[in-house]
Each structure stands twice: as C-alpha cells, then as structure tokens.
C-alpha cells in the first residue's frame, strides 16, 4: 500500500511532541482529531489577513469573507454529494445539528401518540434530544436492539414500525464499537414505511466516502473537529423540501427577512433561517481546509489504509489474554476494550504515563455500557496519521500494565 504516511504525519505538528517523556501516541481521534498545518494556517490567515463580519457588509473585507464562507457551503455539499449547497446548514457540531432537527422538525411535525426509533448504540447526542422532545410532546421512543456482537438486529426494525412511527435516528458508525451500519438498506426500509431518517455521521465522514443522495436519508449530521477541522463547527444536511417546511429553532440576526414591532417577523429561506447570529467564520474556513486535505489524499485510500491498520491492531490486541474486545470484527475507527478487571480509568492513566493517549469512560453511550454490563471501557481510535508502531506501543503498554497489576 502506497499511502504516504510519513508525509501525512509531518503535516500534523502536534504529533511531534512528547508526553511524560515519551513520544506521543495519539489514539483519541474519535473524540477529536489533530489538525494538519493547512487547517491551522487557514484559520490564522483569515484572522490575520482577512477577518471581517459576514452578512450585510458592503466593504471589501466583509464581501470576501461572505464569498469564502458560501464557497465552503458549496464545498461541503460536494463533499457529501448533496443536491444543492442550500441543503447545508452551518452549526456548532453534531449535537447542535440533532437538537435543531428535534426542535424544528420534531416540534412542527410530531405530536402526542407518534413514535420515534433510535438504536441501543447511539451517542447521547442522538438520544437525549429525542427524550426531551418525547417528554414534552408525549411521543414514544422505541429502541432498536443489538446482537451480542454489537451489531443492529436487522430483522427487528420491521417490528418497531407501525402507523404511529414517524422518524428513525441512527448512527452510521458507532462511536464505541466501530460498527458500520448498513445505512443504505436501513434507510430504504424506513422510507418504504414513510419514515423520516436522520443519520449521525460524526464517526463516518473521516473514514469513508459519503453520498447522502445515494444513502437516501433526510438529514445527515457531522462535526468538523473529528474531520481534522476546527472545533465549534459542524454540518446539518437536510433535504431541501423538508428544510423549507421547517420553522427556525433560534431567533436573532441574519435569519430574518423582515422584523416589525407591529407586524412581527418573517424569516429567511433555508438554510439561512437556521443560522441565527454571527457564525464561526474562521471555523468554517478551517473546515474547508480540512475537506481539501482529506480530499487531496482521497477518502478511498484513507479507508483502505485505516482498514489495514485496524486489522493489524485487532490481531495484535487479541493476543493479550486478559483483554476483552467489544464489537464486531469488521469495524471503522475505534477499538473498545477492557483489561482484566481493572477499571478503564486506571488503564488509561498508566497508558498516559507511557505517552499513549486513549479515551476512557462511558463514551457518552451509557445505554451501550448497560448492554455490556460494564461501567466503562477503554477506547483506542485510529486515524489517517496512525501507524503500526503506534499499535505496537499500545500493545506493549497494555502488556506492561498486565504485568504490573496482575
């Protein structure tokens, strides 16, 4: 495989630092990925050489910023193969995107007695907004169960759908197990029953090409900071026909057509009616640079490289006798495990002393922890800049902990 890993690693400045006297092994990209120099430079350039407020500015700096921001909207649409740039809404992240759909689409189209389907593997961001909506409106939440291998029980979906079911919210890739759900087939089954489908792509867009039109989903959400972009910027894709029917969730500047103290307010068309206030313009620029970066490398080569590395990692980790691996054999991005009876926090703390960064805890997936009957897990996540040497360091660290703690 000719993936240019040495060049890629050189593009990420933070990877060259040491932690606790050891060269850093960063295995926490599923929480937040490191940033290539191109993204850092793009934000710096905007702040240093081109900063201005967008919306309604007639001076050159403002006009340039508006043009650049809207160019990124088009770039995002191309990246996920949306039909139009007007189907792309800038938000703070995946969490805000889901809350926007729950509070705009949900409160406008759902009513007491309706039902929503979520899955047992969802991140809290794709659970809690629906629970809040259900509590307020009297909507029922139905849970799509998992198999013992951490995959959706595909045959169970049909039994969850009836005449009251309106919406399915499902992750494309589990943030804990790495399970890659067959989204196209799931969406087809849901749409045949008349459901609206939201797909959480937060753990997918950095690992594989995404085509929202081919998937057929109504909404697709993801965050920039997991895609090697800045924090505080994310994307909500929505089919234009739906967005134009949805009321705004937040009010303020930039999302209006007219405001009158006597006649009330009229709202801008989508997507702008969902972008109240001053946007994170620098973050938008940085997201554009991040998309440029992964596009230049190619998502298919990235996917092939990461899958090869994942197979190697699973093979090496499976040799540690006291280690329990969670999730299916075929997965993307993440490896969840526990070492013997040791608490995940203890394992993570020891690894940190060895310069190895992983994530520990419930990973914003308490229902999944309950499914496996554990309070927490360790999670190592792989990105385009990780190597077999990183995996070997992790394995050696775990073997060292196994000897120390027994």
Swiss-Prot record:
Q: Report the Pfam families cross-referenced here.
A: Aminotran_5
Task: List UniProt keywords, sorted A-Z.
Answer: Cytoplasm, Lyase, Pyridoxal phosphate, Transferase
Is-annotated flag, keyword Coiled coil?
no
Instruction: Give the modified residues of type N6-(pyridoxal phosphate)lysine.
Output: 226
Q: So what EC number does this one have?
A: 2.8.1.7, 4.4.1.16
UniProt key word Coiled coil: no
Give me the reactions it catalyses: (sulfur carrier)-H + L-cysteine = (sulfur carrier)-SH + L-alanine; L-selenocysteine + AH2 = hydrogenselenide + L-alanine + A + H(+)
Query: InterPro entries, from UniProt?
Result: Aminotrans_V_dom, Aminotrans_V_PyrdxlP_BS, Cys_dSase_SufS, PyrdxlP-dep_Trfase, PyrdxlP-dep_Trfase_major, PyrdxlP-dep_Trfase_small
Q: Drop me one GO molecular function for this one.
A: selenocysteine lyase activity
Q: Where in the cell is it found?
A: Cytoplasm
Task: List, in alphabetical order, the GO biological process terms annotated in this UniProt record.
Answer: cysteine metabolic process
Q: In which pathway does it act?
A: Cofactor biosynthesis; iron-sulfur cluster biosynthesis
Q: Which cofactors does it use?
A: pyridoxal 5'-phosphate
Q: Which PANTHER family does the UniProt record give?
A: CYSTEINE DESULFURASE
Q: Which family does the similarity line name?
A: Belongs to the class-V pyridoxal-phosphate-dependent aminotransferase family. Csd subfamily.
Q: Which NCBIfam families match?
A: PRK09295.1, sufS
Subunit annotation: Homodimer. Interacts with SufE and the SufBCD complex composed of SufB, SufC and SufD. The interaction with SufE is required to mediate the direct transfer of the sulfur atom from the S-sulfanylcysteine.
In Swiss-Prot or TrEMBL terms, this protein is called Cysteine desulfurase
Organism (species): Yersinia pestis bv. Antiqua (strain Angola)
Top-down, what is the taxonomic lineage of the species of origin?
A: Bacteria, Pseudomonadati, Pseudomonadota, Gammaproteobacteria, Enterobacterales
The record's gene field reads sufS
């Amino acid at each position: 495989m000719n993936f240019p890993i040495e060049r890629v690693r050189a593009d990420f400045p933070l990877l060259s630092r040491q932690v606790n006297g050891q060269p850093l092994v960063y295995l926490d990209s599923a929480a937040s990925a490191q940033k290539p120099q191109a993204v850092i430079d793009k934000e710096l350039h905007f702040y240093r050489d081109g900063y201005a407020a967008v919306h309604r500015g007639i001076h050159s700096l403002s006009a340039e910023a508006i043009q650049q921001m809207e160019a990124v909207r088009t770039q995002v649409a191309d990246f996920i193969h949306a039909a139009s740039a007007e189907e792309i809404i800038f938000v703070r992240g995946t969490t805000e995107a889901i809350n926007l759909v729950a509070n705009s689409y949900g409160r406008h189209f759902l009513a007491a007695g309706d039902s929503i389907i979520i899955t047992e593997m969802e991140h809290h961001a794709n659970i809690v907004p629906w629970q809040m909506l259900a509590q307020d409106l009297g909507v029922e939440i139905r849970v799509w169960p998992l198999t013992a291998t951490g995959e959706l029980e595909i045959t169970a979906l049909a039994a969850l759908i009836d005449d009251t079911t309106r919406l399915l919210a499902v992750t494309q890739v589990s943030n804990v197990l790495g399970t890659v759900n067959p989204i196209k087939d799931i969406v087809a089954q849901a749409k045949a029953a008349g459901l609206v489908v939201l797909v959480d792509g937060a753990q997918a867009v950095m690992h594989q090409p995404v085509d929202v039109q081919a998937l057929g989903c109504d909404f697709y959400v993801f965050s920039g900071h997991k895609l090697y972009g800045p924090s505080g910027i994310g994307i909500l894709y929505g089919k234009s026909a739906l967005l134009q029917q949805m009321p705004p969730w937040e009010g303020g500047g930039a999302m209006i057509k007219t405001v009158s103290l006597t006649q009330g307010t009229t709202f801008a068309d989508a997507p702008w009616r969902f972008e109240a206030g001053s946007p994170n313009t620098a973050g938008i620029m940085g997201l554009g640079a991040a998309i440029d970066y992964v596009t230049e490398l190619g998502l298919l080569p990235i996917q092939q490289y990461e899958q090869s590395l994942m197979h190697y990692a699973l093979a090496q980790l499976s040799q540690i006798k006291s280690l329990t691996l969670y999730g299916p054999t075929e997965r993307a991005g993440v490896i969840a495990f526990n070492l013997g009876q040791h608490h995940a926090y203890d394992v993570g703390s020891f690894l940190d002393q060895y310069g190895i960064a992983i994530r520990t805890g419930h990973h914003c997936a308490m229902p999944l922890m309950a499914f496996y009957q554990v309070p927490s897990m360790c999670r190592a996540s792989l990105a385009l800049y990780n190597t077999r040497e990183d995996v070997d360091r992790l394995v050696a660290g775990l073997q060292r902990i196994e000897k120390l703690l027994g």
